[in-house]
């Protein structure tokens, strides 16, 4: 499976993953809206939006 792994608004980069899902976490801090992407579907703290998906590069 191929997932995107760039941070926030960086140019798109991808990684090959052993997991069968990709995630996109979104939250806000003093620098504005932050976005993290990667493999799997992690647990997140309250206040963090998590989207998980199951197709290649679906978390862009």
From Swiss-Prot:
<keyword id="KW-0964">Secreted</keyword>
<dbReference type="GO" id="GO:0099106">
    <property type="term" value="F:ion channel regulator activity"/>
</dbReference>
<dbReference type="InterPro" id="IPR054131">
    <property type="entry name" value="Toxin_cobra-type"/>
</dbReference>
<keyword id="KW-0629">Postsynaptic neurotoxin</keyword>
<protein>
    <recommendedName>
        <fullName>Short neurotoxin 1</fullName>
    </recommendedName>
</protein>
<keyword id="KW-0872">Ion channel impairing toxin</keyword>
<keyword id="KW-0528">Neurotoxin</keyword>
<dbReference type="InterPro" id="IPR003571">
    <property type="entry name" value="Snake_3FTx"/>
</dbReference>
<keyword id="KW-0800">Toxin</keyword>
<comment type="function">
    <text>Binds to muscle nicotinic acetylcholine receptor (nAChR) and inhibit acetylcholine from binding to the receptor, thereby impairing neuromuscular transmission.</text>
</comment>
<keyword id="KW-0008">Acetylcholine receptor inhibiting toxin</keyword>
<dbReference type="GO" id="GO:0005576">
    <property type="term" value="C:extracellular region"/>
</dbReference>
<keyword id="KW-1015">Disulfide bond</keyword>
<comment type="similarity">
    <text>Belongs to the three-finger toxin family. Short-chain subfamily. Type I alpha-neurotoxin sub-subfamily.</text>
</comment>
<dbReference type="Pfam" id="PF21947">
    <property type="entry name" value="Toxin_cobra-type"/>
</dbReference>
<dbReference type="InterPro" id="IPR018354">
    <property type="entry name" value="Snake_toxin_con_site"/>
</dbReference>
<dbReference type="GO" id="GO:0030550">
    <property type="term" value="F:acetylcholine receptor inhibitor activity"/>
</dbReference>
<feature type="disulfide bond">
    <location>
        <begin position="41"/>
        <end position="52"/>
    </location>
</feature>
<dbReference type="GO" id="GO:0090729">
    <property type="term" value="F:toxin activity"/>
</dbReference>
<dbReference type="InterPro" id="IPR045860">
    <property type="entry name" value="Snake_toxin-like_sf"/>
</dbReference>
<feature type="disulfide bond">
    <location>
        <begin position="17"/>
        <end position="39"/>
    </location>
</feature>
<feature type="disulfide bond">
    <location>
        <begin position="3"/>
        <end position="22"/>
    </location>
</feature>
<feature type="disulfide bond">
    <location>
        <begin position="53"/>
        <end position="58"/>
    </location>
</feature>
